Amino acid sequence: MNIKMLSAFLIGIILLSAVTACAAPGSQVATPTFLALPTSTLFIGTPPTAAQIPGTPVAYPNPATICGAPQVTAMIDSFKKAILTSDGPLLSTLVSPARGMDVAFYRDGTVITYKPEHAKFLFETTFEVDWGAEPGSGAMKRGSFHDVVVPELVRIFNQPYTLHCNELKHGGATYELEWPYQSEFYSIHFPGTPANGNLDWQTWVMGIEYVSGRPYVYALIQFFWEP
C-alpha cells in the first residue's frame, strides 16, 4: 500500500468516526415530512358579483339614443316575454355582453351583476344572494333571482304599465330618485290604483345600451313608495 492510498484510508476512518460521535445513541435519521397543500376547487363559471349602490357614475360610450328606437322597444318586449315564460336562453341574449346586467331589488340595496352565461339559468338556479334591507322594516331580503326579482317583474308586466325614456317616472316618493349610471334607460312604470291612493305604484328602470349596433340590458333597478 503506498503512502497516498494509506492517507486516503486514514482520512476516511477519521470522518466516519466523527459522524458516529455526533449521532446520539439510539437516534434515528429523520426523514423529511411533506406538508399537504390545500387543493383549489375548480368552478365551472364564476358566480355573480355584488356591490352597493348608488356608486360613482361610470361613463360608457353610447353613440345612439334609445328613445323611440324600434329595436329598443322590440328588445323590451323580448325581455318581457323571457320573464313571463321563464325563458333563460332568451334572457341571456338580452344581457349586455360588454358589462353584464346589474340588478338591484331595492334602490339602495345590493347590486348583483349577472353575465349572459348566468342569465341563461336564472329561472332554474337556487343560488341565493343578499339583496339588502327592506325599506321600513329593515328586514334583510335574501333569495334567488327567481324567487325574489322575477315575481315583481311578472307583477308589473301583467299590469297596465307605460314606458318613459330617460325619465325616472314615479307616483310620489319620500326620497329622491336617482339613476346611478351615465347611460340611457327606460322606466317601466305602473301608476298604482286609486283604491290604494296610488301608493302601490311601481317602477322598474331598465338601463339599455348599444353593443355592436344592438340594444342590450345593462341594469335593472326597482323603485316604489317607501314609508
Listing of model-derived features with the role each one plays in the protein:
Residues 8, 12-16:
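Hydrophobic alpha-helical membrane-embedded or membrane-associated segments
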Residues 15-69:
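Ser/Thr-rich, Proline-interspersed low-complexity disordered segments
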Residues 1-9:
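Bacterial N-terminal signal peptides that target proteins for export
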Residues 78-91:
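Short helix-adjacent coil turns
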Residues 48-77, 92-227:
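C-terminal-biased regions
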